[in-house]
UniProtKB/Swiss-Prot annotation:
Gene label: cpyA
Protein's organism: Pyrenophora tritici-repentis (strain Pt-1C-BFP)
Similarity-based family: Belongs to the peptidase S10 family.
InterPro entries to which the protein is assigned, alphabetical: AB_hydrolase_fold, Peptidase_S10, Propeptide_carboxypepY, Ser_caboxypep_ser_AS
Stated name of the protein: Carboxypeptidase Y homolog A
Lineage of source species: Eukaryota, Fungi, Dikarya, Ascomycota, Pezizomycotina
Main location: other
A Pfam family that the UniProt record links to this protein: Carbpep_Y_N
Length: 541
């Protein structure tokens, strides 16, 4: 059964042929509610639309009329019931942090911690490990609250199974945009998975084996998170992440001195560069950011989209999915795709970036998707679930149990693994195709960056990820490009599980027989990668 045309691709790149926009007849009826803010932004953009941009928009609309007709401009807020403050074990307010001033080396007064935090607060509760049985370690869950914008981000923290007083802390982000990081928790790298009958199954390769891990549902209205408004671009989400981490480490200072790392997959290839840059921009911070890890990410569309045809046509190490005529059609379509992406890169305008996303996803992802083959794993068909994995239904069922929601303090009325409307809102803002790779050189000046990719993924394939790291302009580019791919082996048994190249602060890793979600397909290899990376095994040389 082929992927549903309305499918949102897990963790990141959604094939957008169904999520295209048309002009509304009237904005006036829709602008009463704050959650229609993307519409207001669109109306403002209309005022500055050039004739050339409008012509491009209309051209793409004519090519894919059905897609435009199925457009959705907004998402409704999630039903929720906020708990009394007395039901939480800890509450910390950003205003209290902002009120602390210190004297710097020059004798000048400055805030102890930078950033605009007054509007934020953090609620936390201890999760009794014996109630759910997900893991035996210390756990906290709760919400970051933005009281001004009425945004509430849910998180779930698991302490390291090994040495939590000294082990690193890792933030994990799924992509979408619009997919819950709790799917990563229970399907990929968390302490347990969910079985078909919604039972807990211990994961011996959990990433909290040697690190404490925070799973965050973001942006708002994803998973257990909620809001009466909306976040529809990556940069806006970055401010929330900085606030969350600042308040979390202030409330739990026992974790603030260890090294901190941001990790994620797919659309996190957009998120992580921006989030890391936001954190590093603050001189006075309590976030000890030491590295970032991006798995099968979408970061540089101009480079990565060129490699859809090779991956689909047997040049990525796996048999071809498409026939010769389909491959030729993709070859013919790419120059137009590249031209549209270049226009997006040059202007970063919604009117350039949205058509680029629409055309390129239809031309470069659509032919593969229509075969019914799994876009996350070229080795297998998609199956009956519209997102190709039955586990997502099992996880959704488990996280909708009343006893589970009560145990973690969830305030929404229902949990969904992925919110399709969030995906469309990000597309509406032109976020999909923007050049977030341009942020990476500034990050490389300060901390190491790992780009890893399972080599059986199609949607954010290893060919494209390797290519964009080699196309990136940064001071260490020459040495990085001259570095050779070497075998990556499991310590102890010497089994080769991938290849890696590294120079300076930049590392790329190809993991054999892993799909879009490497920890799901290759749990042992993914944990080996994480442990080696956190230990500095790739960049110290």
């Amino acid at each position: 059964m082929k992927v549903a045309t309305s499918a949102l691709l897990i963790g990141a790149a959604a094939a957008q042929q169904q999520q295209i926009l048309k002009f509304p007849d009237s904005f006036s009826e829709l602008k009463e509610s704050s959650w229609t803010k993307p519409l207001q932004n669109l109306e403002e953009s209309l005022k500055s639309l050039t004739g050339e941009a409008r012509a491009t928009w209309d051209e793409i609309a004519m090519m894919f009329p059905e897609s435009f007709e199925k457009a959705a401009f907004f998402s409704e807020p999630k039903p929720h019931t906020r708990k009394q403050d007395s039901e939480w074990d800890h509450i910390i307010k950003g205003a209290d942090i902002q009120s602390v001033w210190v004297e710097n080396e020059k004798g000048e007064k400055e805030r102890e911690i930078d950033g605009k935090l007054e509007q934020y607060s953090l609620r936390a509760k201890k999760v009794d490990p014996s109630v759910l049985g997900v893991d035996k370690v210390k756990q906290y869950s709760g919400y970051l609250d933005d009281e001004e914008e009425d945004k509430h981000l849910f998180y779930w923290f698991f302490e390291s199974r090994n040495d939590p007083k000294n082990d690193p802390v890792v933030l994990w982000l799924n992509g979408g945009p619009g997919c819950s990081s709790l799917t990563g928790l229970f399907m990929e790298l968390g302490p347990a998975s969910i079985t078909k009958d919604q039972k807990i199954k211990h994961n011996p390769y959990s990433w909290n084996s040697n690190a404490s891990v925070i799973f965050l549902d973001q942006p708002v209205n994803v998973g257990y998170s909620y809001s009466s408004g909306s976040v529809s671009n990556t940069v806006a989400a970055g401010k929330d992440i900085y606030a969350l981490l600042t308040l979390f480490f202030k409330q739990f200072p026992e974790y603030s001195h260890q090294s901190f790392h941001i990790s994620g997959e797919s659309y996190a290839g957009h998120y992580i560069p921006v989030f890391a840059s936001e954190i590093l921009s603050h001189k006075n911070r309590n976030i000890n950011l030491q590295s970032v890890l991006i798995g099968n990410g979408l970061t540089d569309g101009l480079t990565q989209y060129e490699y859809y045809r090779p991956m689909a046509c047997g040049e990525g190490g796996w048999p071809a999915v498409l026939d010769e005529s389909q491959c030729k059609a993709m070859d013919n379509a790419y120059p137009r795709c590249a031209s549209l992406i270049e226009n997006c890169y040059n202007s970063e305008s919604v009117w350039s970036c949205v058509p680029a996303s629409i055309y390129c996803n239809n031309a470069m992802i659509g032919p593969y998707q229509r075969t019914g083959q799994n876009v996350y794993d070229v080795r297998k068909p998609c199956g009956s679930n519209s997102l190709c994995y039955d586990e997502l239904d099992w996880i959704q069922g488990y996280l909708n149990k009343k006893e589970v929601m009560k145990a973690v303090g969830a305030e929404v009325s229902n949990y969904e693994s992925c919110n399709f409307d969030i995906n469309r809102n990000f597309l509406l803002q032109g976020d999909w195709m923007k050049p977030f790779h341009r942020v990476v050189p500034g990050i490389l000046e300060k901390i190491p960056v790992l780009i890893y990719a399972g080599d059986a993924d199609y949607i954010c394939n290893w060919l494209g990820n390797k290519a964009w790291t080699e196309a990136l302009e940064w001071p260490g580019a020459k040495a990085y490009n001259q570095a050779k791919m070497e075998d990556f082996k499991i310590d102890g048994d010497g089994k080769t599980v991938g290849q890696v190249k590294s120079s300076g602060n930049f590392t790329f890793m190809r993991l054999h027989a892993g799909g879009h979600m490497v920890p799901y397909d290759q749990p042992e290899a993914s944990l080996e990668m994480l442990n080696r990376w956190l230990g500095g095994g790739f960049w110290k040389a």
